[in-house]
């Protein structure tokens, strides 16, 4: 049996190293896939499946994609959950002895995929290291150079919440931690990799070599080190370009759990699952991708540091009050490319001349941007002015060296500007003159042969050639040497053309090689300044985010909140930032809010469905979040005492995937709130208890409300919307509980939602009115009204009967000693009463008869 061909032997050897990947094997201008990889790729990419002789008298299934368009195919495979290994030719095929040397240069996974189209959003990869009961989390976006790490102590739910903020596309965990693997799989759709963790000493070695990070403990180092080890192993590059490392403590930021983030629609809407109609969609008016990502980060992690919040607010206020300067700054920002992502391309050596020109255009506006920043006085803007590096040396290098019309490819020539390098100029002159000679030669041959459409062309296989169409074959002279036959033409060469070709090719080849060499030198010089470039990118992102906040404040009539360390939340004429944009400013009804930790701790809000209870409660939470981000808020006036956590229990939904019912999901969320809320927290409860029977639900809602209102237990600021009108009694029983309702106006059988929150409880849910608004047939509504009337009468009867029964028993007890001889008879009468099926009048008559007998008995006793 024949052995595999040498090339296929090489392929099989390399494939053994990446069994879990689809191997893109470079063959000339294509990436080829073989065997099972080819079968999978042809199906997933919808490309033709062919075959290639591989030895052993067999043909291997094969498919391929052009190397210059491979990125889009790789993206499709990554999106479908595959890993892709890139195997490149690492020596010149012309110089190779035997099979061209090839090596795996990169393994691409969901978390290490870099979008060449530069999507605005981050693409994080996360590593979770569990040490005892604690969780060390590290997040990296290799495309922007950002790295964040934190330690979650003994709280798996908090770990889940923190990971959700970054929405990582890939999560790494130890291959030994089966329990953690199940938790991750249950909560995220991310690509989960179980890897063999390296020891802590190796982690520290890697960190020292790659990052120069200090002041992290062993638990965090285990997470950081294993993530770095994975990246180095798959990307085959150094990660010392990652300069933006931040270790943070979760408790140093406003904590918002996953459920609340979803309920408040912070980053995406619940229905469309998109940025549109979310708070992020309103706040993100950034002109750069860097600013957009920073706004999202600020939204995921609002501050609790009053000083830093007010630094942002003061900067936004100054921009707000200087609209002409704001407009000029935003105009400059619009011309800035994604410098963070351009920076990462230096590490991968994938940056091209077009990228450098984009960097140059971005740097070009920096001197003017710095000049405008010098006009401001607020501390944060002055700090940004001082830190903004205009990178004039980098600009000068690119401007003097890179041709404005440079191609994307690095080995096509035309990259280096005239006048930058003498040798380039000399070779370019030869090349240009030779081309002129070719034009002259073409004209000469047309005249000699009489073939008017004769033309000279070039391809990599045959070099320069003379092409003659079929109709002119009879005019071809004998000195023409045939090289290639086409369907409608023949291609020829002459000795004179060969001589010209040698001159041109040698000059052009040397020129291409020299230009590439010079480009690499320029690239490396700029890469040596990468830390300065990244710091400038960070400054630009902050400036952009602050300008976005100022602009939306102007457009949407927001006001600067007073943020302080107290416990009071006072909002005058507050609005929901998203809803008011959807329905129009003039159509939105604003509302006041007053919450504190004393007499306004818990606001019970009643009113019909669709009246606006949920919108009102959400808007309070969103205003708090916006204020603690350092953003102006949709209100006439706002005083926000710092909140440490925001919780919400809104809506009812089954968690089918985990087998949890509506009520179980609801109670789990309530339990999480009761366990983690503090007096500094803000809690939103919407219809607690409606997922079970009326009495169970009422009992639970009542107990929950008592618990959160109790200062000795939680005492948190709480908004509690309910249809259980019985809960309004708590205003009289618990200090700090206040009743509010959404006001409505009745007009006959119809109601008008006034959307106004007013003092006092609501004694009707207006369910039938809402059903009428929803279009329920009138026949059904009339029947519903009949049933409601009977139920209400029955309820009155039950209450009255209960009251009468108590009165009868009291009367009986008082008189029993006077008619002991009649007591059995009277007790029997009472026991035989069908209380629920008698009217109040009948009950009063019976009571009168019993009373009459007792009086008679007393009289007999006294005789």
Curated annotation (Swiss-Prot):
GO terms for biological process: mismatch repair. The keyword Lipid biosynthesis does not apply. Keywords: ATP-binding, DNA damage, DNA repair, DNA-binding, Nucleotide-binding. GO terms for molecular function: ATP binding; ATP-dependent DNA damage sensor activity; damaged DNA binding; mismatched DNA binding. One of its GO terms (cellular component) is cytosol. InterPro entries: DNA_mismatch_repair_MutS, DNA_mismatch_repair_MutS-lik_N, DNA_mismatch_repair_MutS/MSH, DNA_mismatch_repair_MutS_C, DNA_mismatch_repair_MutS_clamp, DNA_mismatch_repair_MutS_core, DNA_mismatch_repair_MutS_N, DNA_mismatch_repair_MutS_sf. Gene3D superfamilies: 1.10.1420.10, DNA repair protein MutS, domain I (3.40.1170.10), MutS, connector domain (3.30.420.110), P-loop containing nucleotide triphosphate hydrolases (3.40.50.300). ATP binds at residues 607-614. Pfam families: MutS_I, MutS_II, MutS_III, MutS_IV, MutS_V. This protein is involved in the repair of mismatches in DNA. It is possible that it carries out the mismatch recognition step. This protein has a weak ATPase activity. Belongs to the DNA mismatch repair MutS family. This is DNA mismatch repair protein MutS. It comes from Caldicellulosiruptor saccharolyticus (strain ATCC 43494 / DSM 8903 / Tp8T 6331).
């Amino acid at each position: 049996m024949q052995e595999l061909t040498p090339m296929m032997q090489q392929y099989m050897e390399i494939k053994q190293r990446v069994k879990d990947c689809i191997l893109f094997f470079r063959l000339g201008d294509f990436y080829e896939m073989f065997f099972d990889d080819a079968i999978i790729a042809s199906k997933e990419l919808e490309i033709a499946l062919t075959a290639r002789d591989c030895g052993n008298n067999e043909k291997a299934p094969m498919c391929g994609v052009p190397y210059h368009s491979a990125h889009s195919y790789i993206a499709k495979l990554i999106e479908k959950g595959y890993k892709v290994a890139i195997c490149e030719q690492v020596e010149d095929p012309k110089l190779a002895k035997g099979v061209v040397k090839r090596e795996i240069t990169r393994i691409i996974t969901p978390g290490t995929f870099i979008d060449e189209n530069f999507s605005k959003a981050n693409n994080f990869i996360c590593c979770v290291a569990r040490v005892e009961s604690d969780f060390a989390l590290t997040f990296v976006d290799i495309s922007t150079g950002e790295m964040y790490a934190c330690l979650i102590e003994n709280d798996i739910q908090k770990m889940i919440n923190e990971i959700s903020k970054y929405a990582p596309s890939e999560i790494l965990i130890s291959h030994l931690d089966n329990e953690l693997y199940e938790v991750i799989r249950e909560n995220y759709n991310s690509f989960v990799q179980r890897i063999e963790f390296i020891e802590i000493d190796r982690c520290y070695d890697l960190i020292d070599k790659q990052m120069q990070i200090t002041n992290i403990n062993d638990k965090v180092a285990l997470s950081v080190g294993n993530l770095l080890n994975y990246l180095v192993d798959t990307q085959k590059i150094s990660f010392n370009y990652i300069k933006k490392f931040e270790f943070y403590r979760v408790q140093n930021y406003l904590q918002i759990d996953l459920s609340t983030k979803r309920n408040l629609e912070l980053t995406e809407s619940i229905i469309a699952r998109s940025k549109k109609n979310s708070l992020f969609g309103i706040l993100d008016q950034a002109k750069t991708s860097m600013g957009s990502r920073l706004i999202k980060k600020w939204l995921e992690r609002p501050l609790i540091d009053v000083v830093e919040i007010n630094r942002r607010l003061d900067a936004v206020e100054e921009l707000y009050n200087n609209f002409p300067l704001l407009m000029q700054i935003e105009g400059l920002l619009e011309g800035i490319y994604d410098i963070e992502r351009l920076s990462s391309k230096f590490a991968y050596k994938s940056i091209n001349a077009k990228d450098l020109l984009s960097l140059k255009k971005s740097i070009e506006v920096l001197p003017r941007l710095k000049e405008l920043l010098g006009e401001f006085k607020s501390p944060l803007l002055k700090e940004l002015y001082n830190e903004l590096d205009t990178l004039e040396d980098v600009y000068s290098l690119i401007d003097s060296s890179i041709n404005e019309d440079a191609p994307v490819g690095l080995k096509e020539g035309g990259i280096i500007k005239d006048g930058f390098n003498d040798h380039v100029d000399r070779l370019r002159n030869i090349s240009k003159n030779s081309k002129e000679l070719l034009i002259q030669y073409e004209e000469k041959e047309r005249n000699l042969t009489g073939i008017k459409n004769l033309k000279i062309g070039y391809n990599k296989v045959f070099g320069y050639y003379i092409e003659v169409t079929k109709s002119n074959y009879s005019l071809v002279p004998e000195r023409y040497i045939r090289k290639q036959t086409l369907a409608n033409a023949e291609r020829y060469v002459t000795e004179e053309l060969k001589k010209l070709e040698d001159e041109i090719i040698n000059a052009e080849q040397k020129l291409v090689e020299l230009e590439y060499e010079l480009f690499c030198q320029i690239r490396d010089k700029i890469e040596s300044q990468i830390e300065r470039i990244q710091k400038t990118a960070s400054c630009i992102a902050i400036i952009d985010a602050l300008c976005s906040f100022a602009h939306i404040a102007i457009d949407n009539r927001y006001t600067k909140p007073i943020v302080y360390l107290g416990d009071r939340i006072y909002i005058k004429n507050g609005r929901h930032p998203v809803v008011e944009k959807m329905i129009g400013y003039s159509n939105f009804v604003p509302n006041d809010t007053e919450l504190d930790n004393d007499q306004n701790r818990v606001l019970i809000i009643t009113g019909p469905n669709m009246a606006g209870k949920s919108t009102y409660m959400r808007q309070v939470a969103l205003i708090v979040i916006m204020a603690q981000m350092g953003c102006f808020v949709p209100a006439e006036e706002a005083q926000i005492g710092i909140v440490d956590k925001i919780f919400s229990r809104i809506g009812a939904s089954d968690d089918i995937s985990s087998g949890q019912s509506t009520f179980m999901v609801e109670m789990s969320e309530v339990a999480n709130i009761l366990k983690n809320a503090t007096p500094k927290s803000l809690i939103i409860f919407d219809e607690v208890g409606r997922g079970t029977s009326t009495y169970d639900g009422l009992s639970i809602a009542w107990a929950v409300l008592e618990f959160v209102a109790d200062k000795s237990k939680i005492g948190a600021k709480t908004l509690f919307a309910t249809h259980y009108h019985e809960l309004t009694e708590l205003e009289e029983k618990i200090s700090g509980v206040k009743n509010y309702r959404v006001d409505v106006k009745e007009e006959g059988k119809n109601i008008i939602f006034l959307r106004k929150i007013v003092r006092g409880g609501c004694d009707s849910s207006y369910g039938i009115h809402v059903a009428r608004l929803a279009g329920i047939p009138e026949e059904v509504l009339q029947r519903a009204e009949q049933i409601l009337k009977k139920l209400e009468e029955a309820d009155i009867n039950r209450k009255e009967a209960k009251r009468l029964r108590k009165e009868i028993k009291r009367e009986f007890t008082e008189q029993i000693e006077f008619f002991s001889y009649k007591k059995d008879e009277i007790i029997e009468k009472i026991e035989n009463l069908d209380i629920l099926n008698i009217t109040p009048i009948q009950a009063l008559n019976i009571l009168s008869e019993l009373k009459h007998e007792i009086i008679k008995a007393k009289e007999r006793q006294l005789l």
